[in-house]
Amino acid sequence: MFSTSDQVSKMNSRILSALLILGIATCVIAGGFCPKSRHPQCNLSYKINDCCAQSDCRVGSVCCVEGCGNVCRAESDTPLGEKFVDGSECKHGHVFPKKWYQFR
C-alpha cells in the first residue's frame, strides 16, 4: 500500500491546506477598522462617495465615512473612524443635498 513517507507527506499537505484555509478565512472575517478621519468637517456643498460597499475597496482597505463622502482607507488596528455599513443608502460619485424647496 502506502509507505510511511507517503502517509506523512499526505498528512503534511492536509495540515498545510487546513492552515491556508484558516488564514484566508481569518483575513476575510477580520474586516479591519477605519483610521481616524482626515477631514471630519466638510466645507463643500456636496459629497463625493468613492465607495458604497466594503467590496468597492481593494484588499487591505475599508470603506470609511468621512466628512466629504465615503472613501477607501487602509485598515487600522483600532476603531478610530466610522466604517461604512453595507446596505446603507449610498450613491457613487458627486452627491448634492436636496434644494431648499425639496424639503418637506
UniProtKB/Swiss-Prot annotation:
Entry keyword annotation includes Lyase: no
Positions of disulphide bridges: 34-64, 42-68, 51-63, 52-90, 57-72
Keyword Transmembrane helix: no
Primary localization class, coarse: secreted
A single Gene Ontology CC term: extracellular region
Tissue: Expressed by the venom gland.
Keyword annotations of the record: Disulfide bond, Secreted, Signal, Toxin
Role this protein plays: Has antibacterial activity.
Family, as annotated: Belongs to the venom protein 11 family. 02 (wap-2) subfamily.
Protein's name according to its UniProt entry: U20-lycotoxin-Ls1d
Organism, scientific name: Lycosa singoriensis
